[in-house]
Amino acid sequence: MKKMTKKAADRKFKLGMHSYTLHLSGLGESWGFQSEGKTYAFEKVIDLDKFMDLAVEEGLEVLHITLVDLDKDTSPEHLEAVKENAKKHGLDLELNVSFNAPSDPRVNATIEEALEIGHSIGATLVKFSTDVEHPHPISHSCMCPEAMTQMAEIVNNFKKNIPTIEKYGMKIAIENNYDLFTDEVIWIVEQLNHPLIGACCDTINSLVMSEGVKECVDKMAPYCYCVHFCDNRVFADPDGTHSLGCAIGDGDIDVVEIMKILREKAPEELDTIDLEIELPLSGYTLEDGRKEEITAMRKSIKYMKEVLGIGTTEK
């Protein structure tokens, strides 16, 4: 990449965190069990109040939360209490929803429901996973007819809700969440062609769609209103090729170069970088896994602040 301009090099972002980072503690989403044909939910040992306390202690500025973190309680009283609690903690909130999550239906919502919930908690952004299904083999299925039919319906549904999006003034982000190729996310955003609607780039999800990480970030950066900032170790052994989540800076994703791309190419609507870690589920007890998540979170926050220059507060 060419040398960054001084303006880009000096660009600041708030430091946020996706609640999925602590999913073993019952936050975010209990993901990954769909292959077993059943749903499973980790016991919640950290509720949203404790999560906000932890965020302040660790120097986070934004929490990227799901309906699981709201305990699926969308009563006006509860959502107003969440909004006020975030204000009291000095935290911004972003809402993460899916249309048809395969293993944890608690995170699912319609566009209409998500907009109302996001507005009620004072969210600055609502991120959508579209759960578009592609035929196999997947590597060459980008923009295939089966996917395009689903995407066209999604575009039309968002268009119907643009008056509400404008009324509430929340940013909207469409994610490459194991279900959309980079070009498909961009197609949806360009079809909607609205200043409040952009993309959410997860820095490792492209691997599942047989895409390169650098190429994905390069393409999506100009559209990014949201980033799930991940690092993974990628390796092969006799059991196959693996991509395992780890603390930021410990993996095979060049996170320094990714931040250079985002600082140079992302629009001003991208004001937050959300840490996300997906540690492996195997190799330790559940209790030890929860401790590992906290350790990886703290190591990542330190790296993102000290090495990547992310964060606008002194703590």
Map each language-model feature to its residues.
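A short, acidic, flexible beta-alpha connecting loop/helix-capping segment that sits on the rim
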Residues: 276-293
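N-terminal pre-domain/capping segments
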Residues: 1-125, 156, 194, 260, ...
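Hydrophobic faces of well-ordered beta-strands that scaffold small-molecule active sites
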Residues: 13-20, 63-65, 93-97, 126-128, ...
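Active-site groove signature of glycoside hydrolases
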Residues: 118-147, 167-180
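Acidic-and-aromatic substrate-binding clefts and catalytic sites of carbohydrate-active enzymes
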Residues: 65-78, 99-109, 136, 176-183, ...
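Acidic/histidine-rich catalytic cores of soluble enzymes
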Residues: 63, 156-252, 256
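A short, acidic, amphipathic alpha-helical segment used as a generic capping/interface helix at domain edges
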Residues: 251-267
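Charged helix-capping and loop-helix junction motifs
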Residues: 76-81, 108-113, 144-155, 211-219, ...
